[in-house]
Curated annotation (Swiss-Prot):
It comes from Bradyrhizobium sp. (strain ORS 278). One of its GO terms (molecular function) is tryptophan 2,3-dioxygenase activity. This is Tryptophan 2,3-dioxygenase. Keywords: Dioxygenase, Heme, Iron, Metal-binding, Oxidoreductase, Tryptophan catabolism. HAMAP family: T23O (MF_01972). Binds 1 heme group per subunit. GO terms for biological process: L-tryptophan catabolic process to acetyl-CoA; L-tryptophan catabolic process to kynurenine. It catalyses: L-tryptophan + O2 = N-formyl-L-kynurenine. Homotetramer. Belongs to the tryptophan 2,3-dioxygenase family.
Amino acid sequence: MSNAPYDPATEGARMNFKGRMSYGDYLMLERLLDAQAPLSSAHDELLFIIQHQTSELWMKLAIHEIKAAMAAIARDDVQPAFKMLARVSRIFEQLNGAWDVLRTMTPSEYTLFRDKLGESSGFQSFQYRSIEFLLGNRNLAMLRPHAHHPELTAELESILAKPSLYDEALRLLARRGFFIGADGQRTDWRGTRAESAEVAAAWTSVYRDPQRHWELYELAEKLVDFEDYFRRWRFNHVTTVERIIGFKTGTGGTSGVNYLRKMLEIVLFPELWKLRTGL
């Protein structure tokens, strides 16, 4: 047996990438790894930046998958949407794990650079707002933090002009012969829809005969799976913030933990949760 170091070239691996696309070229790693610019000398600021930048990358993928799932549902091609929604759930499972890394930063360590953040805050995240709007939580007041970027505001308005993910699921219910009341006549999608007894009754019928309505049943469960992970992400956000800054006002001027706790009260797909009590 030779003690010589292993050389992948002996098995045909390419080792010279002059004039060829390498791993780093494809992923544009030079740009990506140059995108962290701490404003202080604090050791933990790099952790804080990377935590939020990687979250934004995962959110970009979540938006891609949610939009694709919505398009599939709208054209009655429901089964591909199951895979896409399952992937979104896994994305938020990944995002949940990321809080564990950020929680290794102590309050004392955060205070060393918190003042460098100015008024920047996670609630100003354009991609997070896009996800909320795509899911149907359409608080129009949250357009205002993006007013200084007309192109971002226009993109959010474009989302608001169309049905949400849940709206598309309800429209599918209607196309499959279920009565969904006022939701069947909606043409203005800008606001957050009201909970509906007719929609609850329709979903209850699906759950009482899942074999007959398998695609609708599976879609509903994929939506509940996702909201379950999304709720955990919100909860972990609250506990992480409370652990690090307590009940201080947030850098963006919100009430911090109290603001985040209010977000825990939002239910994206209310009828899908409430029907369980009556089954």
